[in-house]
Every structure is written in structure tokens, then in C-alpha cells.
Amino acid sequence: VTSQAIYNENPGKNAFQFHLPNIKTAILAKIGGIPWQLQTRKKSNDVIIGVGAFKSEKIGKRYIGSAFCFNNEGVFQNFDCYRDDDLDSLVGDIRKALGHFVIESGNPDRVIIHYYKTMKERDSAKITDMLYKLGFSIPVYIVTINKTEASDYVGFDTEDPGLMPKSGTIVRLSYNEFLLYNNARYDKPGRYDFLFPVKLKLKKVYNNAAPEDKELRMDEARALLNQVYKFSRMYWKSVKQQNLPITIKYPEMVAEIVPHFRKEELPAFGKTNLWFL
């Protein structure tokens, strides 16, 4: 049963009125509504997969959560949770998701994975091998999104009184490493809630392709970084902007709660519902 809990002492507090927009947003999302979505110019034929993790100090184990998106509007579904070392279950769910996608929309053009840490070669190989066995000859883009904000690099905008780079600013560190400034500074000075940028690493895997097609092009990198930026605006637990995309936030929230369930697994109802908001 979908529910929304409120501590009984909170409604009488003066500050409670400021929490109401967040509560209304979360309730609407939980019952299947769409508080807001991304405006897209063209329909994407991408399968987007988010993988986040949470380690419970009480339980002493790390769990990973996953979420799937079948469009570029930021509406996610098909959530699940696994043990940290159970990548085979994740690969199996990706295979099932691709099967449903093909039935509804035809063959995907790309698979994009937002991952909470650098994916090992043997782990990414399991995914690409699965695609090859299914007959897909499509590129796989792996976007490593560090949950910890990058503090080893500092950027300044000397034209801003607060020296904060404008939100959406991208700094290229190397061939495939970038900093994304994802704060609240737009055309006018705003509150600098997120002082440090998010560090991103991009990887393209395209088996059996021509050598030039295996290389990550800058236009592809920009599109992937723009997607990360936009998905950070799709957080429906609050009207406040986040610095991490929901491809990492939502699976992490699932991975934090599910280990406390009796069987440590997500029931069927919870796989298609934003109950965790």
C-alpha cells in the first residue's frame, strides 16, 4: 500500500508550510502522477539504466539498487535491489528490460548506464557479451558518477561576485573525465547549495564496430553530460534541486531501505512504484 508518513508533532509547527510542496510532490509521484518531466525535442530510442549503492553500517553489507528508463523524459520504472556482489542478477534484469523494450519500441539505439563507481572491465564485459548473444550491435555508454563531490579541483568564475561557475558549466580534465558544476547559480546570483562539482567519467564500449566508431566523440560526451544534468532536475521527493541525477539517487534510496525487509528483497509492487519517496 502506498503511504506518506508525517510526524504528528510537525503540522503544528510554523515551518511545516515550507514542507508541504515537497509532500505534495512526493504523494503525486507515488500515486502514478508526473509532477514535471523533461522537455525533449525528439524521442530517444535509448535504454537508460541507473545503478546506485548504499552500505548499511547496522547490517554491515552493501546493496545496490537499479532503475530503468525507456525514454529520455526522465520517468523511471522497474526498480530492484541486489547484494553488492550479485552482478549476474543485474545483467539478467537488463536482458529482461531489453526484451520488453524491443516488444514496445523496437531495437534500442544505445544502452546508457549511470554507475555509482568505476565499472570493472569484467563487469562491463558481462553486459556487452549479453547484448552480443541477443543479437544487438549497439554501443554501450558507461557514465561513472562519483557520489562524493570533487574537492581536488576548484574552478572560479571571475565575473561572478561569489566566484561560483554557472550551473551547467563543464570542465574537461582528460579525454574522458569531466567536472560538472550543478549548483543553483543561473543568470542571476543564487544560493550556492552545492559548492563542489560532480566528477564524471565516460566510457564507450562498442564491440565489432569500426575503430573510429569505438572512440568517444565530443558530441556524444556533451549529450551524456547534458543527460546527467537534466536527470538531477527530476527528483520528485522535493522541489529543491539536487546535484546528483535520479539515476543514482533513486537506486540508492531503494538499496538503503530494502535490506530491512523481512526477506531482503523487493516485492513485485515495489518494482514499478515510487514508494520510496
Set out the residue ranges of the language-model regions.
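Long, contiguous domain-sized segments
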Residues: 1-277
